[in-house]
Structure formats: structure tokens, C-alpha cells
């Protein structure tokens, strides 16, 4: 029986690390993709030692076309699971942001998701089985603060929903998870001040991963972890977009996301 393989982008911290640890615990071999080669190797060594599984490291900056091509080539060889987790936000206002940084954000958040999914699907379809989990954000479902980041995540949601319809009957599952605020390094790295966010709005990585995999197993396409975020997104769909934007400006207390 072939070994099950999961390829995960951005696995060295936060949600990506949570997925890596969970799939390792479930007996999968791993392909870990990150631009942080040192942390990547340390995580791979730890997970290999724990279960004797094969953990392949693939250092890559998904903002660079050549590195995306390298990861795509690995995917054409076949994996059972692809988790497109890598992504980032930037701080400051859109009109003062470095255009190159904004383009890099789209390269990682959008282009890599498209390219890696395209590379992975043919082998999954041929096998009649496979799972793609795209990590978006609740920001992709809400009108309001945030421009490039929120738009990139809205693209991921729409992309996943469209493919989920097209892949019906193939045995391949397409899923997108839209977390809210999660205790990770994400906001610190982006320079976003989160000190005023109420404690009840925070989610834990393990809970996000657990809910995602449970909902994916049940066939759900758009996965929103946490009852608070289910309530917020449901309410947002029921009111005019102008009111939704106003509510989001209050809810989105983290300032400075572009």
C-alpha cells in the first residue's frame, strides 16, 4: 500500500505547523515547504524522530516564480493531501505600501494557491482520491477593513468553491478554511496591533485544525472555525454590504492590515 503523503506550505509556525503535526500524528509522510530553511529542518527532524515517518523538506519562497515551479514539480509526482497555508499580510495603508510588497503578497496568497492546486489535481483525479485544503481567512468573507489581503482571501474562497463544484464525482475534496483571529505569529510579523481585541475573539491553532479536518471529512467546502465567527459571517450575509462594512470596522479592531 503506498504511503500517504501530505504537502503543507508554511508549516514552521501557526496553523501550518498545526496541520503538519496533525497529519504526522495520523501517520502521513510529509513534504514541508517554507522559506525558513532552519526552522523547516528542525521541525522535520522532530517529526521524523517521533514516528519514524519520512519528512521531506523543500525550502522555497512562494513569492518567487522559480520556487513555485519547484514545488509544483514535486506535486505532479502525487500527494494525497495539499494544504495551501502559506500567506501573509502587510501593515500600513494601501496607498503608502511598497508596490513590490503588495505584488509579493498576491504572488504568495493567490498565485501559489492557483499554481500548486493545478499541479496537484491531475494525480489526485487519476487516483480517484485526494484532498486540497486552502487556508483563507474570515477577512475574505467580510466587507470592511483590509484591502489587498482581504481581497486575496476572497479569491481563495471563490476559487475553492468553483473547483469543488467542478470536481464532484472525482473523489477529490476541495475545502477552504476561513479562520478569524488565531494565536500565532501572524499579526506580529505583519506589524498589526492586536492589543485591543477582546479575548473571546481569539482561536487556538489546534481547534482550527481539528474543526477543519472534521468538517472536511463531512464534505463541507467552506469551513469557518469557532461559533463566534460562524455567527459573525452569518449575520454579515443577512445585512446590506454598507452595514456589513460598518460592523466590520468595529469588529476588526486590529489596525494596520493592508
Predicted regions span which residues?
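Conserved glycine-rich cofactor-binding loop
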Residues: 12-13
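Conserved glycine-rich Rossmann-like NAD(P)H-binding loop of the short-chain dehydrogenase/reductase
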Residues: 28-43
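Conserved NAD(P)H cofactor-binding loop of Rossmann-fold oxidoreductase domains
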Residues: 85-90
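Substrate-binding pocket helix/loop in short-chain dehydrogenase/reductase
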Residues: 93-104
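Active-site helix of classical SDR
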Residues: 117, 152
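Residue(s) in the substrate-gating loop at a strand-loop-helix junction
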Residues: 137
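C-terminal helical subdomain
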Residues: 176, 196-233
Amino acid at each position: 500500500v503506498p504511503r500517504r503523503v501530505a504537502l503543507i506550505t508554511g508549516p514552521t509556525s501557526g496553523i501550518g505547523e498545526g496541520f503538519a503535526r496533525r497529519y504526522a500524528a495520523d501517520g502521513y509522510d510529509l513534504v514541508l515547504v517554507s522559506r525558513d530553511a532552519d526552522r523547516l529542518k528542525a521541525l522535520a527532524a522532530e517529526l521524523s524522530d517521533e514516528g519514524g515517518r519520512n519528512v521531506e523538506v523543500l525550502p522555497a519562497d512562494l513569492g518567487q516564480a522559480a520556487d513555485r515551479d519547484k514545488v509544483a514539480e514535486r506535486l505532479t509526482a502525487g500527494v494525497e493531501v495539499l494544504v495551501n497555508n502559506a500567506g501573509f499580510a502587510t501593515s500600513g495603508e494601501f496607498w503608502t505600501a511598497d508596490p513590490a510588497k503588495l505584488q509579493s503578497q498576491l504572488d504568495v496568497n493567490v498565485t501559489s494557491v492557483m499554481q500548486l492546486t493545478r499541479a496537484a489535481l491531475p494525480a489526485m483525479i487519476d487516483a480517484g482520491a485526494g484532498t486540497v485544503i486552502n487556508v483563507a481567512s474570515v477577512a475574505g468573507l467580510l466587507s470592511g477593513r483590509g484591502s489587498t489581503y482581504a481581497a486575496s482571501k476572497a479569491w481563495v474562497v471563490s476559487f475553492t468553491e468553483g473547483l469543488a463544484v467542478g470536481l464532484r464525482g472525482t473523489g477529490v475534496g476541495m475545502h477552504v478554511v476561513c479562520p478569524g483571529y488565531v494565536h500565532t505569529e501572524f499579526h506580529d510579523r505583519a506589524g498589526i496591533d492586536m492589543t485591543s481585541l477582546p479575548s473571546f475573539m481569539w482561536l487556538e491553532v489546534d481547534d482550527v485544525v481539528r474543526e477543519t479536518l472534521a468538517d472536511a471529512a463531512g464534505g463541507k467546502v467552506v469551513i469557518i472555525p469557532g461559533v463566534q465567527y460562524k455567527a459573525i459571517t452569518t449575520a454579515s450575509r443577512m445585512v446590506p454590504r454598507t452595514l456589513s462594512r460598518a460592523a466590520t470596522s468595529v469588529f476588526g479592531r486590529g489596525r494596520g492590515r493592508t
